[in-house]
C-alpha cells in the first residue's frame, strides 16, 4: 500500500502529513486527531481501510507528533490550529473532501465550519466531541462520582490544592481514563499506540492538567449557539462509556440541522479501538452515502 509522508511549511514551523492509498473518485477523509496534544498515531489503525480504494489523509497538528513543537505558548490556541487546517487544505489541494475529527479534532471541525464557512466539504464526522467545554467539565465531574471513594477524594484534593503531582491523584486519574477513555498502551498494544505523541506542552497550555480541570486556552470554548450555521451532512458518534457522554453528544446533534448520531455500545472515548470493525463500517457507510 502506498504511503506518502511530508511536511507543509507553516509560518516558521512545519506540519507533518501522511497520505495512505491512491487517489480515486471517492473523496478522501481528512482525519483530525484529538488532544490538544495527541497525534495522528492512532489513525494508523485505519490504514487497511485505504485498501478499499479510498485514500486517507492524516496529519500532526503543530505542537504534536512529528510536527514542530514550538516553545511559544501563544501558538497553542484554536485559531492557530484552524489556520493550519486552512493551510493544509490549500497545500494538499483538498478542494473536495470528507472530514473526521476525533475529540478535540471534532471541536476544531466545529470551530472551522462555523467561523470560516469553508467550501467543498462533502461530509463531516464528529467523533466524541463537545461543543461546550463548560458542559464537558460538568459531565466529567458527574462521571467521577462513579469512581471509588478513595479516587474521588484524591481528585477533589488535587482540584482544591492545584497539586496534580500527588501519587494518589495520578493513580486515580489513570483509573478514570482507563474507565472512560482508553487503556494506557503497553508492550502488547499496536505499535502506533506505543509511539510518543510529543504533545505534552500543547496539552497543558491548551487544555490543562486533565479532562476535568480545563483551565487552558480552550477552557472557554463554546460554539453551541453557532452550530446552526453548519449546512453540510454531519454524523456525530460517541460511546456509551465515553468521556463524551450521551448528553454531550446530543447537545451537538440537537444544534446542527439534519445531523445524525451513532452511539457505539460498550465503547469508551475511542470507538476506533474499542469497536474497531463497527467504527470502520459506520465510517464506510457514511462516506459512501455522501460522496
From Swiss-Prot:
The keyword Hydrolase applies. GO terms for molecular function: aminopeptidase activity. Signal peptide: none annotated. Keywords: Aminopeptidase, Hydrolase, Protease. Transmembrane segments: none annotated. GO terms for biological process: proteolysis. Residues 30-274 form the AB hydrolase-1 domain. Its EC number is 3.4.11.5. Releases the N-terminal proline from various substrates. This is Proline iminopeptidase. It comes from Lacticaseibacillus rhamnosus (strain Lc 705) (Lactobacillus rhamnosus).
